[in-house]
């Protein structure tokens, strides 16, 4: 994950000092891109230990269209707790937009089912896009979507995915986002009988929080290890039928975890 460390170095060297919604303060750059060949290993950061269980369960939760943290709590995942109300609800965040985007007619669009069908039947389409940025419902969401839109691309029998992330917490959030969308790309490729291509990450306001600087410097002092491999142990009937035990990460040798505060 040398690309990730290079991004951190770029922000430290060239980032602008900015204020932000949380009042924490950031050092930020605008418009940055990284590319990961998914045939060269699973892009999970090795310069600190990442909590893979949270990444997988969050993705499965999104795919079910769920927007209440109860499922996450059942699996000891607390990454959304700071934004949930007293009943565990988050409003129409990612899962709702992915699976039931409301239309003017009163119906809803299941973008995930739609995209799978389009990849299978129209692989050269330039409309293989899923969006979570529903302007009409932003005020109902506990947190506006950071990873706002992703697009699939099929060429030479390989599936690639590009994510546009309008706002990115590089130290805490980005390792999760890269791994989550890389895994989603693997799942979609399996469902569509395609080989793996690239995962491309594109960031808008790409920042390090001011209270993550020491942690960032510690991480930059560590030598990255070889990437692990992710195995999917079975092919479920649909994209919605994967379970946590279907995924096996092998040869993950990370440096120790680095604790840092979340900006809320």
From Swiss-Prot:
Residues the entry annotates as binding (6R)-5,10-methylene-5,6,7,8-tetrahydrofolate: 51, 169, 263
One BP annotation, GO: methylation
Keywords: Cytoplasm, Methyltransferase, Nucleotide biosynthesis, Transferase
Reactions that this protein is recorded to catalyse: dUMP + (6R)-5,10-methylene-5,6,7,8-tetrahydrofolate = 7,8-dihydrofolate + dTMP
InterPro entries the record matches: Thymidate_synth/dCMP_Mease, Thymidate_synth/dCMP_Mease_dom, Thymidate_synth/dCMP_Mease_sf, Thymidylate_synthase, Thymidylate_synthase_AS
Superkingdom, taxonomy of origin: Bacteria
GO molecular function, one term: thymidylate synthase activity
Principal cellular location given in the protein's record: cytoplasm
Gene Ontology cellular-component annotations: cytosol
EC number assigned by the record: 2.1.1.45
Gene3D superfamilies xref list: Thymidylate synthase/dCMP hydroxymethylase domain
Active site per the UniProt annotation: 146 (nucleophile)
Binding site for dUMP: 21, 126-127, 166-169, 177, 207-209
SS bond list: none
Localisation per UniProt entry: Cytoplasm
Pathway per the UniProt entry: Pyrimidine metabolism; dTTP biosynthesis
PANTHER family named among the record's database cross-references: THYMIDYLATE SYNTHASE, THYMIDYLATE SYNTHASE 1
HAMAP family membership: Thymidy_synth_bact
SUBUNIT field: Homodimer.
UniProt xrefs under NCBIfam families: PRK01827.1-3, PRK01827.1-5, thym_sym
Role of this protein: Catalyzes the reductive methylation of 2'-deoxyuridine-5'-monophosphate (dUMP) to 2'-deoxythymidine-5'-monophosphate (dTMP) while utilizing 5,10-methylenetetrahydrofolate (mTHF) as the methyl donor and reductant in the reaction, yielding dihydrofolate (DHF) as a by-product. This enzymatic reaction provides an intracellular de novo source of dTMP, an essential precursor for DNA biosynthesis.
Family per similarity comment: Belongs to the thymidylate synthase family. Bacterial-type ThyA subfamily.
Protein name, entry field: Thymidylate synthase
Organism this protein belongs to: Shewanella denitrificans (strain OS217 / ATCC BAA-1090 / DSM 15013)
Lineage, opening ranks: Bacteria, Pseudomonadati, Pseudomonadota, Gammaproteobacteria, Alteromonadales
């Amino acid at each position: 994950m040398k690309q990730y460390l290079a991004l951190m170095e770029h922000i430290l060297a060239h980032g602008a000092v900015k204020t932000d919604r949380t009042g924490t303060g950031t050092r930020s750059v605008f418009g940055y891109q990284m590319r990961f060949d998914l045939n060269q290993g699973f892009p999970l950061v090795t310069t600190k230990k990442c909590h893979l269980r949270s990444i997988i369960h969050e993705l499965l939760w999104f795919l079910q269209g769920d927007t209440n943290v109860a499922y996450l709590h059942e699996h000891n995942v607390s990454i959304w707790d700071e934004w949930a109300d007293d009943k565990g609800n988050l409003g129409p965040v990612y899962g709702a937009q992915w699976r039931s985007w409301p239309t003017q007619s009163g119906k809803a669009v299941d973008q995930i089912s739609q995209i799978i069908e389009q990849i299978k039947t129209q692989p050269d389409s330039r409309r293989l896009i899923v969006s979570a940025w529903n302007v009409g419902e932003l005020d109902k969401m506990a947190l506006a979507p950071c990873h706002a839109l992703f697009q699939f691309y099929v060429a030479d029998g390989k599936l690639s995915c590009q994510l546009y992330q309008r706002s990115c917490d590089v130290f805490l959030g980005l390792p999760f986002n890269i791994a989550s969308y890389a895994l989603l790309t693997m799942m979609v490729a399996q469902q569509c009988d395609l080989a793996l291509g690239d995962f491309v990450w594109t960031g808008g306001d790409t920042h390090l929080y001011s209270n993550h600087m020491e942690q960032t410097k510690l991480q930059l002092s560590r030598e990255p290890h070889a990437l692990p491999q992710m195995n999917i142990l079975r092919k479920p009937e649909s994209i919605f039928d994967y379970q946590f035990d279907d995924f096996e990460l092998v040869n993950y040798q990370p440096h120790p975890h680095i604790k840092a505060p979340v900006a809320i």
